[in-house]
Each structure stands twice: as C-alpha cells, then as structure tokens.
Amino acid sequence: MALLQISEPGLSAAPHQRRLAAGIDLGTTNSLVATVRSGQVETLPDHEGRHLLPSVVHYQQQGHTVGYAARDNAAQDTANTISSVKRMMGRSLADIQARYPHLPYRFKASVNGLPMIDTAAGLLNPVRVSADILKALAARASESLSGELDGVVITVPAYFDDAQRQGTKDAARLAGLHVLRLLNEPTAAAIAYGLDSGKEGVIAVYDLGGGTFDISILRLSRGVFEVLATGGDSALGGDDFDHLLADYIREQAGIADRSDNRVQRELLDAAIAAKIALSDADTVRVNVAGWQGEITREQFNDLISALVKRTLLACRRALKDAGVDPQDVLEVVMVGGSTRVPLVRERVGEFFGRTPLTAIDPDKVVAIGAAIQADILVGNKPDSEMLLLDVIPLSLGLETMGGLVEKVIPRNTTIPVARAQDFTTFKDGQTAMSIHVMQGERELVQDCRSLARFALRGIPPLPAGGAHIRVTFQVDADGLLSVTAMEKSTGVEASIQVKPSYGLTDGEIASMIKDSMSFAEQDVKARMLAEQKVEAARVLESLTGALTADAALLSAAERQCIDDAAAHLSAVAQGDDVDAIEQAIKNVDKQTQEFAARRMDQSVRRALKGHSVDEV
C-alpha cells in the first residue's frame, strides 16, 4: 500500500524545492566552487572540464577576464593582470610593499592607507578584484545548476583576522552573493574527511596553499567538529616556493635586470612548471630567456627546506596550544596544492610519525567541505546533527582603570559566543563611560592591540560604584566582533561592530601569544601594582569627598592623623612598591574607621529626623 508523505510548509525535501547552495574555496592561486547534487558532493568544472579557476583577473578599458584567459595575458600585460590578491586582503599598502617588494603592480594609497591598484580599468582595491573572481565562480555554479544561488559558504584561512574576513564578506556582497557563513579552510577539510571516513579522535589539518599556511588541531567526536587550536602564517605558501625557484633560475641564467616585468613573469612561469614536474621526476629541463639548464629535486628541496621547517614549527606551537603530543594525533589531513610537493609530505609524515591522508584531492577537499556545510545551512538538511565549533585566535577584553586589560573572552574560545561582564563607575556623579575594546594576551593596555572605542552616555549620576554597566561581547560564526554596553537601571545602551581597516599579521599574533608566556610573571606583578594604584586613587578620592562634607565631625588631632595617613598613601602610590601601597591603604582605612562610623550615625539621625518610633 502506498503511503502519502506529508511535510510542514517550507520543509519539504522534494527535489524541486531544494534550495541552491554552493561552497567556494577562494584561494590565493586557484579557486573552486562545489555543490551537493543528488546527494553527492562535486566540484563544478568550466566548459573545458577544468575544475580549478586561477585566481587571476586581467583588466582592460572595455572589461576584464578571469581565470585561465587572464593568466595567459600575465606575461604581456603584467601591470593589469592581478594575481594572488588574497595576500592583499585586509592589509595596508605599507605592509604589502614591505612584504612583497617585487610585485609588478602600480599601487596608490587610499585615504586610510589601504592599497589601490592602478589598472587600465581604473583604481581597484583587493575587495573589487576578489569580487570579480567570486562572480566568475557564481556564474559557473548558476549555469551548472540552472538557477541563481540561494547562498554560499566561502572558506578563509583560519588565521584571517576581522579585517580580512570582513573584506571577504564585502567582496561576496559586491558579487551579489548571500554569504551563509565564512568557514575556516581546515575546518572545511575536516568536514569532508569526517563524513567520508567517519574518523573520531584528534586530527591535524595541514593546509599549505598558494599563499597561506594553516595548521588546525581538531577533535572529531560523534558528529562534532571542535577546533582545539589553530596556527599558521598568512604570508607563506606555494607562491614562496615559486619565487625562490624563480630567483634560483635567474641566478643560473645570469639575469640581473629585475625591472622587465615580462621576463619576471616568464621566470615565474618556468619555476611553476618546474615545481610541478619535480613532484614526479628527479630532474627537469628549464628553458627561459634564452637559457637552458637542468634543475634537480634535491636542489629544489634545498631551496624550500627552511620554509617547510617554518610550517612544522607552527605545527608544534598549535599542538602545544591544544595540549596534545604528535603521537596523540589520529590522522593528518593534507590540504592545498602545495602539499603535493614530495618534501612537504615527507617532512610532515616524519613530524607526526604517520603517513598523511591524501585520499581526497588536496585542491578540492576544502571546496567539498564548504559545499556540504552550505547544503546544511541553506536548509536542505534540517535534520543534520553536525555541529561546527571554531575558535578565536586572541583574547578579547576591555581597558579598566589603571591601564589594565580585563579579558572577557579568552583565546581559543569556541565561536559563535557571547559573554557579558558587569562594570561600575569610578567617580561620584559619573554620567558617561569610555569603552575601549582590546585584543591580546598581556595584562596591560600598552602591550595589547586596540580594536575600537565608543562611549556610553546617559548613566544616572550616582555615587561611585552605584551604577552598573553590563558589557556584552558577541563573536559571530564568521569571527566578527560586536560589543554592547548597557546601564542596567535605565536601559540606556551603546554598541559598536569592530571592523578595523586592516589587522594583525599571523607573525604578530604568534608574537603576542609568545610574549604573554615570556612576560607572564612580569605582567602579573605589573597588574598587581596597577590595581593597588587604582585602589589608592579611589580611597583618596572618596576620603576627599567625605572630608569636604563632614570635616566638622573630627577633632583637630583626628584630622591631622587622617591627613598624615592620606599624604603617606599619596606619596607611596607614586612608587612601585605594591606592599607599601597596600599597607598605606590599610592604614588610611584604620585611621578613618571612627570617622566613617560618625558619618553613618549622622546619616541615620538625619533620615529619622521628624519621624516617630512607630513610623520607623
């Protein structure tokens, strides 16, 4: 007997009601788009069957081309052919020029110091270039799926900061795409491998792409993907292998002129071809700029050995953060085209003591994971139990009195997350509070990074400590931060979304974490000193107000004792002796106890004046 299947409105899984979603791997060197079709995940090819789209855009006055056609124009029109734009996302022009001094583009700075690339199509920023790549991928998906996309999941390196993530979302919006979520690339790979092989335990995802390196330590258990720790370098990848090999070929060929962009591109193309060939062969013949020679795999390995070692040092730091040893790692997932280099696979295998997983094409695995996640988020799998937990790389907090940082969300907290903490006013009658949002691991403001400032006004004028302000930090699934401050009694509030124009480099993040450990003892002492100084200032300010109001309650001798104690506290508070300040505060408290009792009695008498015992 046939059964009639009934679904709630909007939740039908009928094929014609499926929403169209895609996962996009927006890579430094190549990009891909993937989708789930008929229950199967697949990357979508172009008309010629090519799945990879080179992340290259060639601009002309009358328009632009993306992908292979653009890459083919690179040698003839270098200044108008933009590649590896992902490296520029969220960075200042000064940072880009310091990191990549030989880029063949004509740069100009925007009013806030961000890069603008001068092309035949006009001045373009990295967001616009990225948007053109995303448009090409979206067009491929729409044509293949015979419809417009309802949403996309776009992957980003795990170490991308707020500015880089926001830039990626802006590029997607410019391309007309609805972003369901930004997803860390290693996490996307874990989704792909987790569903394919059903592994449970600690997994390391080693992601070496064209321009970025990420290492993530994840725990997979019962459908839950939890990122224990992340690390990496957003300015290290296969492109660096290419440039090292290109420089080596230049030396061998005796080419001294670096100003000829056409020769620069020819050298780079020869280096890329040689690198690919050396993954399968021990030697390769190179013919460039009239020079012919031979490059061996051993020579190539010598050139890149130091860079591979840098990736392994990042792996060691991530393992330490996660609290696991290399032998605790169940599997090592290899992601990114650069993991095809034999030396990389060999060194990674030696480090972790096991053969890395390469079952899924390392170029496609991230896009596959993103497509699976997009299919879930768009609503095609409402019953999915997969839970995804990412982490923030650095602690978030607020500046408090004395230049201290009060951490609200510690680093490696899983996101999305919201945490609230209550603060109070420092002075009598205070009606406004400045909120200074900080990022970092140190105890003092001067050693952390300022993210944003905003003010909460309209606080009721109460005695110091009388008003209560709740500050809420919220980090969404894309790693973007918003902060809200609200005075509890009135409900007055102010908020800000943190969107810095450009953010921290991975080296700076790693340095901040390292410094927090190196200076831990020193920072604790500095914090204790600052806290005692703040308390001393509070005590002295309260005492001044009390003496102004009720000095008549004291005899001359009593007033002198209090003045002496206050003067001593004021003097020692200028120094660095924590114990001396603490003792001076206790002495002021001792000398003012009788004064405080008399003030209390006086307040009670005033409150009861004119009232009978029965009324009380």
From Swiss-Prot:
The keyword Chaperone applies. GO terms for biological process: iron-sulfur cluster assembly. GO terms for molecular function: ATP binding; ATP hydrolysis activity; ATP-dependent protein folding chaperone; unfolded protein binding. Gene3D superfamilies: 1.20.1270.10, 3.30.420.40, Actin, Chain A, domain 4, Substrate Binding Domain Of DNAk, Chain A, domain 1. Keywords: ATP-binding, Chaperone, Nucleotide-binding. It comes from the Bacteria. The keyword Nucleus does not apply. CDD domains: ASKHA_NBD_HSP70_HscA. Belongs to the heat shock protein 70 family. NCBIfam families: HscA, PRK05183.1. Chaperone involved in the maturation of iron-sulfur cluster-containing proteins. Has a low intrinsic ATPase activity which is markedly stimulated by HscB. Involved in the maturation of IscU. This is Chaperone protein HscA. It comes from Salmonella agona (strain SL483). The gene is hscA.
